Design a protein with these regions (language model features):
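The feature captures the beta-strand-to-loop junction immediately N-terminal to the Walker
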Residues: 34-36
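Helix-to-loop junction immediately C-terminal to a conserved catalytic motif
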Residues: 49
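H-loop/switch region of ABC-family ATPase nucleotide-binding domains
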Residues: 185-186
Length: 215
């Protein structure tokens, strides 16, 4: 699915958190959002997901305006920073509860995504998860429905080198399947290694757009 921001601004109270953003994200590529904490990366993801709507301008998903033509994208997986799950449930049960909302995801698919993120053999309750395990479960939740749009906000936080490689492999696989992937990451080199294009964000404004050199 393609995504377009047309003259998009967002105010929270008296603060302008996104200011006149105009970008187009093509279908089936990996796009990075680069910037310091509070720059507007997460806010842009929330706008794409339909969790909030633009104060001015339009966020357009495949030609349809969010908040006007559609309430939210029809096929989207989202992992915002610090994902929250039920503390008394294990990973499988948390994902099964989410899957039950649509009732279209089989137990075998849940087992598969837990295997993909390295949590298949772990039966701990979520409250006993390490930060890295919580990140892994958040990624699993974002990809288990095989969505057309995948938003990953700082997916490599709290992950060791092997976990970061796992994220790279997942992103590459989702791109190969045709998904539009948008992610943020504090590590510029890691972000560039995963992305086809990167938008730099400062104080809610796009200040640069470039294609990473991967040679």
């Amino acid at each position: 699915m393609s995504i377009e921001f047309k003259n998009v601004s967002k105010k929270l109270g008296n603060n302008i958190v996104i200011n006149n953003v105009n970008i187009e994200i093509k279908k089936g590529i990996v796009t990075g959002l680069k910037g310091i904490n509070g720059s507007g990366k997460t806010m842009m993801m929330r706008l794409i997901a339909g969790l909030i709507y633009a104060t001015k301008g339009e966020v357009i998903i495949d030609g349809k305006v969010l908040g006007k033509d559609i309430s939210f994208p029809p096929s989207i997986g989202l992992m915002l920073e610090n994902p929250a799950f039920l503390p008394s449930y294990n990973g499988f049960d948390n994902l099964k509860m989410l899957a039950s909302i649509k009732g279209e995801i089989k137990d075998e698919k849940i087992d598969e995504v837990l295997e993909t993120v390295g949590l298949a053999a772990i039966d701990k309750k979520y409250r006993k998860y390490s930060l890295g395990m919580k990140q892994r479960l958040g990624i699993a939740a974002a990809i288990m429905e095989e969505p057309d749009i995948i938003l990953l906000d700082e997916p490599t936080n709290s992950l060791d080198a092997s976990g970061q490689e796992m994220v790279k492999e997942i992103v590459a696989k989702e791109k190969e399947s045709g998904a539009t992937v948008i992610l943020s990451c504090h590590d510029s080199a890691l972000l560039e290694s995963m992305c086809d294009e990167i938008f730099n964000i400062e104080v809610g404004e796009i200040t640069n757009h470039y294609v990473p050199d991967k040679e």
